[in-house]
């Protein structure tokens, strides 16, 4: 089963996300702050991470940067799911290394499409550079 780590400190947001992703067939784990998210990612080795930006202890931008800087977690796709709609937040998240950015409230079908796209891309072998 595909494991998704959700890093979300708002109980209501997590409950909705957990319920919908579980119904879609994913195994969902939760971390409630950025530091916990970084540690859980190392331990769980999830297939994908969905992360908020406004997190206690370590914000989502910094947590993303740390995950992408570590050899044991840099391969894990990260989708930022945030209420920040401004372009500067999106640009900062992409610069930190996230693979996709969605705003809340999320269109769940678009979110699942992006999850599937990132998981398929991760499973594909790298292109042969000799050709």
Label each region the model flagged.
Residues 25-32, 40:
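Short hydrophobic/Thr-rich beta-strand motif most characteristic of the beta2 strand and flanking loop
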Residues 2-12, 17-21:
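Conserved acidic segment of CheY-like receiver
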Residues 44-50, 55:
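Active-site beta3 strand of CheY-like receiver
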Residues 106-116:
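C-terminal output helix
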Residues 56, 74, 86, 105:
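The feature encodes the CheY-like receiver
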């Amino acid at each position: 089963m595909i494991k998704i780590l959700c890093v979300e400190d708002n109980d209501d947001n997590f409950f909705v996300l957990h319920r919908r992703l579980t119904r879609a067939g994913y195994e969902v784990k939760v971390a409630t702050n950025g530091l916990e998210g970084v540690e859980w990612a190392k331990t769980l080795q999830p297939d994908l991470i969905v992360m908020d930006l406004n997190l206690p202890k370590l914000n989502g931008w910094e947590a993303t940067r740390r995950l992408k800087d570590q050899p044991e977690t840099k391969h894990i796709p990260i989708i930022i799911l945030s209420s920040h709609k401004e372009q500067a937040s999106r640009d900062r998240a992409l610069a930190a290394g996230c693979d996709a950015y969605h705003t809340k409230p999320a269109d769940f079908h678009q979110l699942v499409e992006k999850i599937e796209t990132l998981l398929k891309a991760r499973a594909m072998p790298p292109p042969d550079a000799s050709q």
